[in-house]
């Protein structure tokens, strides 16, 4: 699979031969959907919580007598039928949202995403991405010169300078291959991969 090799101005300078096992696979929409949903589900913290009828703070006194009022009988105001009462099936903080994805399925799904991005022209290769100092302004100017506004950069190695220079950039994320995830791949408009990262992606997803 031939990918565009971009220069410093963001223009296609030449072609780069990328491995077909990662960048030339057929697109499997169902598989991609499954790994994206599973990744988002596994990222949930499970911190939401609601109270049932035992946890809400209400008096246990019977609100009115059992018979003779014409109203439906009621035992206490903490009943889920009453306003301010507890929930019947409350959300609990220990709820488990995790979904299991087999390693082969995950690798195949990631390769399908990379391949589809390449076919759509949303994926390109650059020689490298390095900065001399942890300054955001020069790096932002470089991306602006390449006409990139929403981009995921997969670099072979993200050193401290590159991390500090890129972390404040809006709509720009710089990660190492091991931290590339399906949600980020489908979210950003453009994906840049360094030559060294291509080899690592081949080891991970081929």
From Swiss-Prot:
Gene3D superfamilies documented for this protein: 3.40.1370.10
Matching Pfam families: Ribosomal_L4
Biased amino acid composition, Basic residues: 58-70
Gene Ontology biological process terms, A to Z: translation
Protein keywords: Ribonucleoprotein, Ribosomal protein, RNA-binding, rRNA-binding
Cellular component, GO annotation: ribonucleoprotein complex; ribosome
Single GO MF annotation: structural constituent of ribosome
Key word Transferase present: no
Segments of this protein annotated with the region Disordered: 44-77
UniProt subunit comment: Part of the 50S ribosomal subunit.
NCBIfam families for this protein: rplD_bact (TIGR03953)
Record-stated family: Belongs to the universal ribosomal protein uL4 family.
Function per UniProt: One of the primary rRNA binding proteins, this protein initially binds near the 5'-end of the 23S rRNA. It is important during the early stages of 50S assembly. It makes multiple contacts with different domains of the 23S rRNA in the assembled 50S subunit and ribosome.
Protein name as catalogued: Large ribosomal subunit protein uL4
Organism whose genome encodes this protein: Variovorax paradoxus (strain S110)
